[in-house]
Amino acid sequence: MTYAGDRQILDADSHVMELADFLDEHIDPDQRDRLRRRAMDAFAPLLETAMAGAATRRADTTAATQAEERLLEEKGWLALGAFDPVERTRALDLLGFEGQLVFATFATTMFAGRDVDRLYAGSAAQNRAMVEFCSGDERLYPVAFVPLVEPARAVALATEAIDEGCAAVMVPSTAAGERGPTHPDLDGFWDTLSEANVPFVLHVGGGGRLLDPAFHNNDMPVTDHLGGGENVRSKDYLAIPHSPALFLGVLIYDGLFDRFPKLRGGCIEQGAGWVVSWLRQLDYGQRAFKRTEEPLRELELAPSEYVRRHLKFTPYPGEPVGWMIEQAGSELFMFSSDYPHPEGGKDPLAKFKEALWTTGGDAQRRFYHGNVSELLSGSTTD
């Protein structure tokens, strides 16, 4: 029996845990020496342990069986299939999911920054590496990363990623350099996604620093419970919705979905409880400002209706998903495991099952499968 059991599941969020050489075979030779490799140096002892563990599993069936039994207990690089694509196929067999979107984790730290040449070369290398990681299993859907600071490069990079087989394109949930994300210069990028029937996605970490570190300076230190890699703490959690709520609201208010009615987007690993009140806020904002702002008057639909037609969100395990569906609709929310990241927990299905126990079967099928299918293809069989 798989973890999913007899439930049909598509997973909207999983990750590869990159090794230090993840980009090496894929980056343009003239950019290879410009990667900021020190960004991965802090993980060297853990990577050595993880690689040794994977080698042991390949040589020792008992060790492999033990790892399979701890499938959702081990996290990060220590998890089964964290960086080995053959093991990842086995992990997906055990999970029983029909497919999962696969995001990068740390590779971006090697090329992010103000050096635009390095940024785009590194992004292209990461996209190629993601495609290679997923290439051996059609259930693994690679997610590209495309910065928007240079529109022409963004179009070229998105085109390459889509042609190579990326199932979605992650964009930063920030302004595009000196431009807003709806600037006409970026219409070519949004048109590329729309015409290719490929969604854009936002992901936690894509909006820059969550909050000023001074908010943590309160003489009340807390434990580094995740080991340095992904330390989202309570105050960071409060700030997570700010970036996607603003970015997606700007797309709606500026009429992007009227210009590109086939465009779809997903908001991944940023929670979704905030969406219920955000829908009302969007509609109120239009009513309050449309007299003085022509773009708001020209919208063909209520802002909340664009959300329902074009956007999807992944709740965290433990959020009151049943109530959220009741308040906002069954078409908005998607299951995600975050495998093998620790935020997904050791039993996300149990937490979602508890939150959905009074929710009807059709709405549950949309949550576990149909809405992810709709994000990826524009249609759902549920």
What are these regions (language model features)?
Residues 21-24, 114, 211-216, 277-281, ...:
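Short aromatic-enriched loop/helix-cap "lid" or pocket-rim segments at secondary-structure transitions
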Residues 12, 19, 102, 145, ...:
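Generic beta-sheet signal
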Residues 17, 29-31, 35-45, 106, ...:
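N-terminal-biased segments
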Residues 140-141, 146, 152, 156-327, ...:
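Catalytic pocket-lining loop regions of alpha/beta-barrel enzymes
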